[in-house]
Design a protein with these regions (language model features):
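Bacterial N-terminal signal peptides
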Residues: 9-18
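An ectodomain-focused feature that recognizes extracytoplasmic/extracellular
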Residues: 23-113
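Generic hydrophobic-segment detector
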Residues: 6, 25, 124-128
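Short, solvent-exposed mixed-charge patches
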Residues: 169-170
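Bacterial N-terminal signal peptides that target proteins for export
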Residues: 1-9
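Acidic, glycine-rich flexible loop segments
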Residues: 95-164
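A generic alpha-helix preference that emphasizes hydrophobic side chains
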Residues: 18-20, 131
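A broad, structure-centric signal for solvent-exposed, well-ordered loop/edge residues
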Residues: 8-10, 40, 49, 127, ...
Length: 170
């Protein structure tokens, strides 16, 4: 190894070690939908928060796969928390089989959309990381337009908990 190669290798190693790492979003969403229990690990690349510390918008995405690592069940859950009072919650659940969505359920805050409620048990902000935990409850129904209009004629109950530590969206 020449001096120049050695110096370059040392410089590259220094910069690799000196580059700050990004914290990973962690947590899970545990739901009971129509009497069936599900636990969804948070998808760290799709979960974050934005806004101010006293008025955050929180967006969580989570997925669970079957034992073969296929046919995911996907949850998207979001809400605002102005002065740490949850509002405007939205919950979406999609179950895939053989690459096709076989079940899609939606819920939101208004009574005609499932009366989804969020209760915050804890919250804290440390630099760009937000930690929250709480529970949700409501009804879920189907929709032909991705949750804009939710049909509750065959609604199913949903309840559960969430715990998450997520990074602020840049």
């Amino acid at each position: 190894m020449s001096f120049r190669t050695s110096a370059l290798s040392t410089a590259l190693m220094f910069f690799a070690l000196a580059t700050p790492g990004h914290a990973q979003s962690t947590g899970e969403i545990a739901l009971t939908i129509a009497g069936k229990d599900h636990v969804f690990p948070l998808d760290s690349s799709q979960s974050d928060w934005s806004g101010r510390e006293s008025w955050p918008s929180i967006s969580l995405s989570a997925r669970a796969f079957n034992d073969a690592g296929e046919d995911p069940k996907v949850v998207s859950f979001s809400f605002d928390a102005g002065n740490w009072m949850p509002s405007l919650p939205e919950l979406r659940f999609t179950h895939y089989e053989d690459g096709k969505a076989v079940q899609k359920l939606f819920s939101a805050e208004d009574a005609e959309d499932g009366a989804l409620t969020v209760t915050l048990d804890s919250h804290s902000v440390n630099a760009s990381l937000l930690s929250v935990s709480g529970s949700i409850e409501g009804s879920m129904g189907t929709s032909d337009n991705y949750g804009r209009d939710i049909d509750l004629s065959n609604s199913v109950p949903v309840s559960g908990t969430f715990t998450a530590t997520v990074e602020k969206l840049d």
